[in-house]
């Protein structure tokens, strides 16, 4: 049995200038337990080479394709332990499958893939090959979301009776009407069905609501009734969704990328028979807790009265805001901890505190149910 202390990882996608690839690299670096040693950063040769040189990837481990990378790295004695997939949605499935079949652990951006069948296949391969598979639903990584989960699980707000959550942005507002297509790299592929899949807004941000609510409450949608607005574009830019959970509780999700004045307005509100919890992403270090008949309480990250997972994954002192990169680091803390156990011959009986391929499959099912509901007169649709 080996006793490795550090991991080796590779990346597909995430060339210089790409937003999310840089976030993943910084988050992994914060954990100080893994080194980037191989990559296929871009299908464009010049961009791939430029990024490889910047991150000091040796030439023989800078690959022209993910297929070549998976094959070569799996054959090396010092090959990568896991791969990070930060490509556009359309290639998640094929890239993840190639590395799973090569026996390499996977971390993949959401949404997991295009179809439910693809997601279930990836889940099966990972299970059969005993491989770890993280899907980076960011917001479950925030310390105060973890506190909300612990309070709800402990019954501090009583029985959950209602959920009301929103995720509002305005970065696609110029697309309304379909005649003003912006030319930023992200907006072009996000609004293209060939690259983004059957949904833009729900697939990009609505699925974050579904996953974060499920993480905090343990409740999963049973059926949905949804209205999607395309505003002249090929894919949705606005969605309003009624949700019925498996336990009969109902909720409302609203997500939009055309709400002027809202930059990244994710708000999760869980209402119980004895109180409520509310977390707002743009003020991530705070959690509002209200008990019926009592004044509101505001919990601050990093303080002595915050314990459990929220304290364990606290990086810097209170008053110094933590944000997106730290949330990703918390996800990688759990994922890389499990990968390290695997490479040392200790397969974990239970995965750590991070979203897995099963959460990714749940997200794909949610997206399909929402889109199908909207296409069918907003009727109730099974998830």
Residue ranges of each PLM-predicted region?
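Predominantly a Rossmann-like dinucleotide-binding segment in NAD(P)-dependent oxidoreductases
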Residues: 139-233, 287, 377
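N-terminal Rossmann-like dinucleotide-binding module
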Residues: 1-57
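C-terminal helix-rich "cap/oligomerization" subdomain common to oxidoreductases
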Residues: 1-6, 84, 334-383
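C-terminal glycine/acidic-rich active-site capping loop/insertion
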Residues: 138, 182, 186, 215, ...
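Short, Asp-centered acidic motifs that coordinate Mg2+ and/or phosphate
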Residues: 38, 82, 162
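Beta-strand-loop-alpha-helix segment that lines the small-molecule cofactor/substrate pocket
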Residues: 82, 88-140, 155
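A structured beta-alpha segment of the ubiquitous adenosine-cofactor-binding alpha/beta core
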Residues: 61-80
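Glycine-rich, aromatic-lined ligand/substrate-binding cores of catalytic
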Residues: 203-285
